[in-house]
């Protein structure tokens, strides 16, 4: 879809869990992994040994960041086929996820520590980009993605998800819901009572939801209760605001940008460039090209990775031709 500020898209809300990103965090033995693996059609990606007491769950062994990249590539390269088998992808857990990524970047640049790379200036940006690209790829094709994290207190005693801020930022920022789980101890028979889930921030802990009408507290945290809370939140929004929720695919199409084709862009640039040249405006064409590509670089030298830059050049040339 071509970009036109005078014909903007109108945001829509998708029903169901498809395409939702959820972070679940809390201390140990609260049911984070157990309930996540009870979501629909799960595939579990263990960055730590979370399945030792849970049987019957489909998983992919993850022993390195390279393993994760390969799995992520298969999930996203042919997403429609993958979604026939899986609906929920579970990443367990975020802090270990960060450590695997750190090790990978160190190996990539042949250094012992992230801070040793780049002549002592560190490889923080490379590390951050590596993590962001893989997360962005995973959450962009329509799976329900669940990130599991441990909990840690800040200096003031408030509880937050535990992990490197460079990894937590893209996880939390992209999460539609961040749940904090709290223990309910044991009953009179000394049997564990299911934990409770918080979906809104308090003075004691961080949590949040993008859904204004969602229940902010689930007395009993289960996969079924979480799914029910999300579905009901969208239904309440429909009733309160008079909207009609759409499918994930409809929402994705609504949010899509123009698909850029290298050959089409090159042909259009050449065609408009020739017209401008016939008008004696070659110098202006060169000014636009050099502004975006650098002095002495021609559009015909662009690679297929530069379609974004080419699309901007084409827009500028169209404006020039219209003057």
Curated annotation (Swiss-Prot):
Coiled coil: 222-272
Keyword Coiled coil included in the entry's annotation: yes
Keywords: Coiled coil
A Pfam family per the record: AAA_24
Stated name of the protein: SPbeta prophage-derived uncharacterized protein YorG
Species per Swiss-Prot/TrEMBL record: Bacillus subtilis (strain 168)
Encoding gene, per UniProt annotation: yorG
